[in-house]
Amino acid sequence: MGRYELHYGGDRRNNAPAMRRDYNGGLIAFSRYFSFFSSRTCSPESSINNQFRLLCITCDTLTTTHNFSQLLRQCIDERSISGIKTIQAHMLKSGFPAEISGSKLVDASLKCGDIDYARQVFDGMSERHIVTWNSLIAYLIKHRRSKEAVEMYRLMITNNVLPDEYTLSSVFKAFSDLSLEKEAQRSHGLAVILGLEVSNVFVGSALVDMYVKFGKTREAKLVLDRVEEKDVVLITALIVGYSQKGEDTEAVKAFQSMLVEKVQPNEYTYASVLISCGNLKDIGNGKLIHGLMVKSGFESALASQTSLLTMYLRCSLVDDSLRVFKCIEYPNQVSWTSLISGLVQNGREEMALIEFRKMMRDSIKPNSFTLSSALRGCSNLAMFEEGRQIHGIVTKYGFDRDKYAGSGLIDLYGKCGCSDMARLVFDTLSEVDVISLNTMIYSYAQNGFGREALDLFERMINLGLQPNDVTVLSVLLACNNSRLVEEGCELFDSFRKDKIMLTNDHYACMVDLLGRAGRLEEAEMLTTEVINPDLVLWRTLLSACKVHRKVEMAERITRKILEIEPGDEGTLILMSNLYASTGKWNRVIEMKSKMKDMKLKKNPAMSWVEINKETHTFMAGDLFSHPNSEQILENLEELIKKSKDLGYVEDKSCVFQDMEETAKERSLHQHSEKLAIAFAVWRNVGGSIRILKNLRVCVDCHSWIKIVSRVMKREIICRDSKRFHHFRDGSCSCGDYW
């Protein structure tokens, strides 16, 4: 056999070795020559392909397995498929054993990322080793081509090639990716026959993971119980499955069993079981697991820290969660999102928005869930301007068509009284689902656009989407706020006929609809259909009695409420106000004395207004705590004078205390929404004035704000505890029905 001997008498410009024919060697000189050109500062195509082609033309044969492997490794390092193809051509020319060359070429092609060429080589092989089958199946699954992986597995079985532990541990993942449950069960049976289910931990772990993804935690647990040697991966897979399926008690039990069996948890075990503790609000076990995590050295692991943070937030221990967050050296997107969403869920919206701003300053890119949480924080506080800025961030990062960020925007604009802007966002969503439809329907409902809400509900039905309990509540609320009594009754009857599970909240909404329409007997009759009427249901009916001044019925309902919750302050306050509105001052004194004895306090009426991204708070009767109180009172007096010129007269029935008439007038002038509006007008805020109130707007303030909107020629949007009121040109969107 001929050989090319290297000497340095060749190209002096680049110091390349020359070759001459020698008959004593093999591929050593060839390999040295190949390595020399591979090390030059030239492109991979030049170093591998061109030089290799030159050698292949001049060489007679290449026969050493070691040298072929060396050349293929060089191609893998350079990720050169063209080099592999050249080697394959020369292997065929040299008569290299096909069963060896094929396997090596498939392996090299896969490592270079060309699965299709690897498959082409594989299909041309007459004999295929199990290792080659496994490699190709594993790479297909890794590159999300599970369907092809399963087809290859079927071909393997057809060719009477028995799978081994590596085949099965790979293909079980493909089955779960494609939801091929029946085929997965057949292959599980094959694993049992081959003795791999019990004896091999890789197969056992893959089976547990597969059944978990099918949502079959019972089957996953049976597999785990049969595996002889259990490890952390196996048990963690089951705990993750329990946690994801909401079987949190079982997740905690599995973790406890793990400790009994002396299997050391890893950071992912801790992360999963802590989420379950949070879902259960099981702070006892949560703190115990936190202690174990510290003892095991996993306290600084990011996955464990994030789950610990989430657990404390779900248990409403905000201070503990903040301490955990401060210990995270480099918080990532997931950590920030967990903190922000948890703070919003715990009613710490202002803090959540502060943390969101810190996240943006740290240049951590938010995801759609982060943005959705920040937007809900703005919507809960009616922070319109702040929300609009976050809308800009949503657009910047390309989430304006995302359903989660989109729903957050719809919720924001809906709760800031801008249903038209909410609808614009809704119409741009790339995917309409039940969540986005519910959010838009609720936006219409709370802003008094009942017909639009019902049209959207009809669209939902036509799209074939199944309404859920939120949909039903939003639709009934739309009818309630728009005085669509008959439509609401028809819908409620249809929901009952369709056997939709109706909750106490749905019944409370219908009781409110009928009660406000003056159909109190029907409303009371409806309560008899509820198996366990709760306080909300009875209070709703009691509120209707107050509106229509039905004292006798109210007293009867009050007795029922106090049987459920003795000393319920909301009920006593409602009854006190009802007695006051009907002139029964002796009963008012009696109720207030009872409240005093029970040390009950009425929640103060409060209003908020956002000015230049800063929220200002006003409390009824508090005239001097605000730094601009002098200017506010001057402006309020001027507004009251102008409104009286246009016919405003104080409605003294809204004062539930026995006092002089002039004192009643002063009391009405000091309501929190009046103070907030006076401040906003004094600050000369452009555009609409947006007020948020924690209680219902009283009749007197409602009448006054209507006139002020006409005086100032400004829209005033007031969101109270019940709904939105859009005041324009002396009228309100509610039609004086709230």
Curated annotation (Swiss-Prot):
Residue ranges of PPR repeats: 98-128, 129-163, 164-198, 200-230, 231-265, 266-300, 301-331, 332-366, 367-401, 402-432, 433-467, 468-502, 503-537
Alphabetical list of PROSITE patterns matching this protein: PPR (PS51375)
Stretches the record annotates as Type E motif: 537-612
Spans traversing the lipid bilayer: none
Keyword Repeat on entry: yes
Family in the record: Belongs to the PPR family. PCMP-H subfamily.
Name of this chain's protein: Pentatricopeptide repeat-containing protein At5g65570
UniProt source species: Arabidopsis thaliana
